[in-house]
UniProtKB/Swiss-Prot annotation:
Matching CDD domains: STKc_ACVR1_ALK1, TFP_LU_ECD_ALK2
GO biological process: acute inflammatory response; atrial septum primum morphogenesis; atrioventricular valve morphogenesis; BMP signaling pathway; branching involved in blood vessel morphogenesis; cardiac muscle cell fate commitment; determination of left/right symmetry; embryonic heart tube morphogenesis
Organism lineage string: Eukaryota, Metazoa, Chordata, Craniata, Vertebrata
Gene source species: Mus musculus
Residues that hold ATP according to the record: V214, G215, K216, G217, R218, Y219, G220, E221, V222, K235
Subunit organization: Interacts with FKBP1A. Interacts with FCHO1. Interacts with CLU. Interacts with type II receptors AMHR2 and ACVR2A. Interacts with BMP7. Interacts with BMP9. Interacts with BMP6 (when glycosylated); the interaction may induce HAMP expression. Interacts with TSC22D1/TSC-22.
Domain Protein kinase stretches: 208-502
Name by which UniProt lists this protein: Activin receptor type-1
Record topological domains on the Cytoplasmic side: 147-509
Sequence positions bearing Phosphoserine: S501
Inactivation phenotype: Deletion mutants show a recessive embryonic lethality. At 7.0 dpc, mutant embryos did not show any special abnormalities except a smaller size. However, at 8.0 dpc, mesoderm formation is initiated but its development is arrested around the mid/late streak stage. In an osteoblast-specific manner loss of BMP signaling via ACVR1 directs osteoblasts to increase endogenous bone mass. Additionally, mice lacking ACVR1 in cartilage show reduced SMAD responses, but also decreased p38 MAPK activation.
Length: 509
């Protein structure tokens, strides 16, 4: 049994029916209703305001858990409310002020497959008996077919799936003909939006089959998984990094992170198997892998280089800015930006991942939320003020300037792999020539703070106008004085200008 906050995980109820033409119209300006709010997710509030109200019932460790609340984003309500009830969970939705006050969700009766069959037993006569016989025969045929289908699926599951609980109690959902990508893109562009309400259920984890481990680190593993035939990424956090899982889950469920250059969020889940707890973060899957791995194998032309760095700058600018309104977001600083935490998409753009150390700030309340995570960022990418411990920890702008320093180092990594005049450098991490492979805090402090060294700029860059502009830009990210560094928005505008000048040059030619 997991204690404290860990008993009620933040899980997503995800069932995606095939959208009709009418469903595909955006529902941004839906009317808001006052709803009764009951359950742990409500805190001290007894009501909330959203576009739909709900009442849910789920079974957690043998206990019936009732919750009431509201969906603040229409697409979330649409996805959840159309989920058919299962033996372990049910949700009923409505629209109207306080409409969920007298609604209590009911679990389906065991073994009730065809609700209308009881009516047939009340009828008499030859015709009715014939219909009942036909229905029973059809049910038997379907039952045999489903059993064979389930047995075939179980034979395909590997031992890892057994360990993570994807066989026992497997719940399937009818998602029509729509793919996961289409439904997620329709509901949340390519980011997550804010997460679904805290409905206590285990649907998501039990529907995912883990296929292969694609990455390991000191804080956990990343697996390629399959959900209803679609690839997803499953990050399984180790117990030592529980705070990072909780932080990412909190961010994705409270902040509108809908952006094509932020890793798209699907669900967060927790399972307890064999006396151990697995913490899952389920996101979009990008088969190209991290920017770190991509640069080691791939050289870049001018267009692909600019596409990568501009997309990273766009994602960082979106994190840093605060957006006001009902569809707004708090300002966020990443605090661990590096090439390993940036993923490459099929279209050549990138998206920023791993928000486990992120800091949030709201201007309206002037509240700085640094979380409660003992983990620190990557030493190689630490800014001078972090290394010499002069950073103003109570100032949000300080954390944004730390991100800008790290962005400059990532920009340097990418620029080295851009071919100009037939010349290109091998991939190397920042400060590869002055610190060991796993530098200590003191190693980096001496190089960056005492000696004030910066990554070397090759001479060949100055014969290429694009690389010359990028070199100037990265130097403005590396000022020893944090307040002198560029902002993410200024970097984005500068890179856009460089990209536009390249397009103009091609047109003139």
């Amino acid at each position: 049994m997991v204690d404290g906050v860990m008993i009620l995980p933040v899980l997503m109820m995800m069932a995606f029916p095939s959208p009709s033409v009418e469903d595909e119209k955006p529902k941004v300006n839906q009317k808001l209703y006052m709803c009764v709010c009951e359950g742990l997710s409500c805190g001290n509030e007894d009501h909330c305001e959203g576009q739909q109200c709900f009442s849910s019932l789920s079974i957690n460790d043998g206990f019936h858990v009732y919750q009431k609340g509201c969906f603040q984003v229409y697409e979330q309500g649409k996805m959840t409310c159309k989920t058919p009830p299962s033996p372990g969970q049910a949700v009923e939705c409505c629209q109207g002020d306080w409409c969920n006050r007298n609604i209590t969700a009911q679990l389906p009766t065991k073994g009730k497959s065809f609700p209308g069959t009881q009516n047939f037993h009340l009828e008499v006569g030859l015709i009715i008996l014939s219909v009942v016989f036909a229905v029973c025969l059809l049910a038997c045929i379907l039952g045999v077919a489903l059993r064979k289908f389930k047995r075939r699926n179980q034979e395909r599951l590997n031992p890892r799936d057994v360990e993570y609980g994807t066989i026992e109690g497997l719940i399937t959902t009818n998602v029509g003909d729509s793919t996961l990508a289409e439904l997620l893109d329709h509901s949340c562009t390519s980011g997550s939006g804010s997460g679904l309400p805290f409905l206590v259920q285990r649907t998501v984890a039990r529907q995912i089959t883990l296929l292969e481990c694609v990455g390991k680190g000191r804080y956990g593993e990343v697996w390629r998984g399959s959900w209803q035939g679609e690839n997803v990424a499953v990050k399984i956090f180790s117990s030592r990094d529980e705070k990072s899982w909780f932080r990412e889950t909190e961010l994705y469920n409270t902040v509108m992170l809908r952006h094509e250059n932020i890793l798209g969020f699907i669900a967060s889940d927790m399972t307890s198997r064999h006396s151990s707890t697995q913490l899952w973060l389920i996101t979009h899957y990008h088969e190209m892998g991290s920017l770190y791995d991509y640069l080691q194998l791939t050289t870049l032309d001018t267009v692909s280089c600019l596409r990568i760095v501009l997309s990273i700058a766009s994602g960082l600018a979106h994190l840093h800015i605060e957006i006001f309104g009902t569809q707004g977001k708090s300002a966020i600083a990443h605090r661990d930006l590096k090439s390993k935490n940036i993923l490459v998409k099929k279209n050549g753009q990138c998206c920023i991942a791993d928000l486990g150390l992120a800091v949030m700030h709201s201007q309206s309340t002037n509240q700085l939320d640094v979380g409660n995570n003992p983990r620190v960022g990557t030493k190689r990418y630490m800014a001078p003020e972090v290394l010499d411990e002069t950073i103003q920890v109570d100032c949000f702008d300080s954390y944004k300037r730390v991100d800008i320093w790290a962005f400059g180092l990532v920009l340097w990594e990418v620029a080295r792999r851009m071919v100009s005049n037939g010349i290109v450098e091998d991939y190397k991490p920042p400060f590869y020539d002055v610190v060991p492979n796993d530098p200590s805090f003191e190693d980096m402090r001496k190089v960056v703070c005492v000696d004030q060294q910066r990554p070397n700029i090759p001479n060949r860059w100055f014969s290429d106008p694009t690389l010359t502009s990028l070199a100037k830009l990265m130097k403005e990210c590396w000022y020893q004085n944090p307040s002198a560094r560029l902002t993410a928005l200024r970097i984005k505008k500068t890179l856009t200008k460089i990209d536009n000048s390249l397009d103009k040059l091609k047109t003139d030619c």
